[in-house]
Amino acid sequence: MEVAAPLLCLAAAVLVWGVLWVWGSWERMTRPEQAGLPGGGSRTLLVTAHPDDEAMFFAPTILGLARLRHQLFLLCFSAGNYYNQGEIRKKELLQSCDVLGIPPSNVMIIENRDFPDDPDVRWDPDRAADVLLQHVEANGIKLVVTFDEGGVSGHSNHVALNAAVRTLQAEGKLPKGCSVLTLQSVNLLRKYLCLLDLPCSLLLARDALFVLTQREAAQAQRAMSCHRSQLLWFRRLYMLFSRYMRINSLNFL
């Protein structure tokens, strides 16, 4: 008993410290000036490859930026027509965006032979960069959000979008004051830890971190459920276990 008491006190102290540290991190996550993000009212463009990317991978970022009062736009580079379901998937995308708070007028879907929904086709990053820049300039965008070089799942279309924003930045073509955030790809184990990945996400380097509340997580689930044509059994498991349904870590280019 004499030995147990100090150990219990130590455990309690560690627990309190952990709670305070997580709370402090949460405070930093919800303050745009501390996170290095543009302030409220800023126009943010999410750039995705396929309908359902916005819900499968970026829901924490979308809802986190909405929490910070960003005006959100979505540019989807394909209609997701790999299985000839393009028309269905466009409607599902608009429904998902509505759940996530992005109005139809702010959703742009590209249907161009240069950008087929096909993991075996490498999109031309220069062509993608030109299209992306047009939308950035036309909408007065201050923040672009897209995939990192790993593309989360390694899909070649995701990776091409990262190459496109890197091309724009390297050539100095982005408008003054426009920054780029990329979504961190993580290893397979972390990818399916859901909220258990939070300690790793807090400890490891990143420029921005968004973690959904329980209510927001339910909203993300509803958005993903709009993509009925894609809800095969393994995607239902993904919805339950993937950290990307609850946590997004991002870095500035």
Curated annotation (Swiss-Prot):
Parts of the chain that traverse the membrane: 3-23
Biological-process GO terms, alphabetical: GPI anchor biosynthetic process
InterPro entries: GlcNAc_PI_deacetylase-related, LmbE-like_dom_sf
EC number of the protein: 3.5.1.89
GO molecular-function terms, A-Z: N-acetylglucosaminylphosphatidylinositol deacetylase activity
Domains: entry comment: Retained in the ER by two retention signals, one located in cytoplasmic domain, and a second signal in transmembrane domain that is functional in the presence of membrane proximal residues of the cytoplasmic tail.
Protein name as it appears in the record: N-acetylglucosaminyl-phosphatidylinositol de-N-acetylase
Lineage: superkingdom: Eukaryota
SUPFAM superfamilies linked to this entry: LmbE-like
Cellular component GO terms, alphabetical: endoplasmic reticulum; endoplasmic reticulum membrane
Gene3D superfamilies per record: LmbE-like (3.40.50.10320)
Biochemical pathway: Glycolipid biosynthesis; glycosylphosphatidylinositol-anchor biosynthesis
Sequence similarity: Belongs to the PIGL family.
Membrane topology: Single-pass type I membrane protein
Organism taxonomic ancestry: Eukaryota, Metazoa, Chordata, Craniata, Vertebrata
Reactions that this protein is recorded to catalyse: a 6-(N-acetyl-alpha-D-glucosaminyl)-1-(1,2-diacyl-sn-glycero-3-phospho)-1D-myo-inositol + H2O = a 6-(alpha-D-glucosaminyl)-1-(1,2-diacyl-sn-glycero-3-phospho)-1D-myo-inositol + acetate
